[in-house]
């Protein structure tokens, strides 16, 4: 699996991340062509190679051709929605802007639809966010890790006056994320950078086991006492080499609630909201409570930094008045996604490995369902053929199967 590690020793901002992606191999001309799909003609984009404390990096500049344009979230949603961008880029970009809107709304004590974006609604923020999403997509990065984030200290000038560092919206977005400050004055982590990194990253800590393929440095505008750079390392997760054992270990939180008085029709919508918000798993079990009442035990597994968001959804969308939270340790087999061709069409197959052998071969259900609807053939028949084709593919590539 292609992964990236963001080393945020000098914070993170949208332009620094975009610069790091370009420095790590994202084709700048291709990026410009992709961004042209936004149909915004109010800016010019250019790159510059700079030195920060003797380290070369790429600085991305977005030059606005018009005055500072303030936009509402609905304006940004309309721009992205009608764009010619790929669906996955649209979806992730909208998710990031929605995260920003929610954070701003909470800070200002208003509804997300009433938020009037200032810096976030400017064209440079739109280009930074959509450009970063394009970069991860173009480089084939499937998983993102990050270090604890250096946020800086002091005050920063904003539309509402002087704000403490980290800015309130930044701190809200970084809830549950490890942050720190050293003797560096100024805003190092911006709301845009915080929104992007928390939308992509579920694990904040030291370097994962990764086979380094390329490294990029994105440069900030300020000159600091430390290199004002964001370092991006891209490569294959070493744990997920098909020929390696590499059982991965991780940590998460489990949230539990007992519910005996909720309309069961509401669970479908609840599951959808939890997964969209970043839940790792959601499931229910039948239980029996006091007074012999039939009920369900609703369980949600979530990354640490998503705790507040999950808690809010559970209290808003269920009838519970309390919940339990437990830290858990997870062990996961490395896996890879293969695409196989069948008489019905192409489909993805997830293959898990242990001790150098393929131990689980699972066709992706959504692909199987799509082919069943397309051809009218039985779903189970399509599932089995895809599974057999996958085994043949694995044999042909010399990976043993249990």
From Swiss-Prot:
Assigned EC number: 4.99.1.12
Family recorded in the similarity comment: Belongs to the LarC family.
Catalytic function, reaction form: Ni(II)-pyridinium-3,5-bisthiocarboxylate mononucleotide = pyridinium-3,5-bisthiocarboxylate mononucleotide + Ni(2+)
Keyword vocabulary terms for this entry: Lyase, Nickel
One Pfam family from the record: Ni_insertion
HAMAP family from the UniProt entry: LarC
GO molecular function, one term: nickel cation binding
Keyword Hydrolase annotated: no
Function field: Involved in the biosynthesis of a nickel-pincer cofactor ((SCS)Ni(II) pincer complex). Binds Ni(2+), and functions in nickel delivery to pyridinium-3,5-bisthiocarboxylic acid mononucleotide (P2TMN), to form the mature cofactor. Is thus probably required for the activation of nickel-pincer cofactor-dependent enzymes.
Alphabetical GO biological process terms: protein maturation
Protein name as catalogued: Pyridinium-3,5-bisthiocarboxylic acid mononucleotide nickel insertion protein
Catalytic class of the enzyme: lyase
């Amino acid at each position: 699996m292609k992964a990236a590690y963001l080393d945020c020793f000098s914070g993170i901002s949208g332009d620094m991340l975009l610069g790091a992606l370009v420095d790590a191999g994202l084709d700048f001309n291709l990026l410009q062509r992709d961004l042209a799909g936004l149909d915004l003609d109010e800016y010019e984009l250019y790159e510059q190679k700079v030195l920060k404390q003797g380290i070369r990096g790429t600085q991305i500049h977005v030059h606005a051709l018009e005055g500072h344009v303030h936009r509402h979230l609905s304006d940004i949603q309309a721009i992205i929605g009608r764009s010619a961008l790929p669906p996955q880029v649209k979806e992730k970009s909208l998710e990031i802007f929605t995260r920003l809107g929610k954070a701003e709304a909470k800070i200002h004590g208003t509804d997300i639809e009433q938020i009037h974006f200032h810096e976030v609604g400017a064209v440079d923020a739109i280009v930074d966010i959509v450009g970063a999403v394009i970069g991860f997509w173009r480089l084939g990065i499937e998983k993102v890790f990050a270090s604890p984030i250096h946020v800086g200290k002091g005050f920063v000038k904003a539309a509402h006056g002087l704000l403490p560092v980290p800015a309130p919206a930044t701190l809200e977005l970084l809830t549950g994320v490890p942050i720190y400050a050293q003797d560096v004055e100024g805003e190092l982590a911006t709301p845009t950078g915080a929104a992007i990194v928390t939308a992509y990253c579920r694990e904040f800590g030291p370097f994962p086991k990764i086979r380094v393929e390329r490294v990029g440095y994105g440069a900030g505008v300020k000159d600091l006492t430390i290199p004002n750079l964001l370092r991006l390392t891209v490569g294959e997760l070493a744990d997920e080499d098909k020929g390696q054992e590499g059982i991965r270990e991780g940590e998460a939180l489990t949230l539990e609630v007992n519910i005996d008085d909720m309309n069961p029709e509401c669970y479908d919508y609840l599951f959808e909201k939890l997964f969209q918000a970043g839940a790792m798993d959601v499931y229910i079990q039948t239980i029996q409570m006091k007074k012999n009442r039939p009920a369900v035990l609703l369980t949600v597994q979530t990354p640490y930094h998503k705790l507040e968001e999950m808690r809010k959804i559970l209290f808003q969308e269920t009838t519970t008045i309390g919940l339990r939270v437990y830290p858990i340790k997870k062990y996961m087999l490395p896996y890879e996604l293969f695409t196989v061709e069948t008489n019905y069409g192409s489909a993805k197959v997830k293959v898990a490995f242990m001790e150098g052998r393929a131990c689980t071969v699972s066709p992706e259900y959504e692909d199987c369902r799509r082919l069943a609807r397309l051809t009218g053939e039985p779903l189970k028949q399509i599932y089995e053929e895809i599974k057999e084709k996958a085994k043949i593919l694995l044999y042909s590539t010399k990976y043993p199967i249990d």
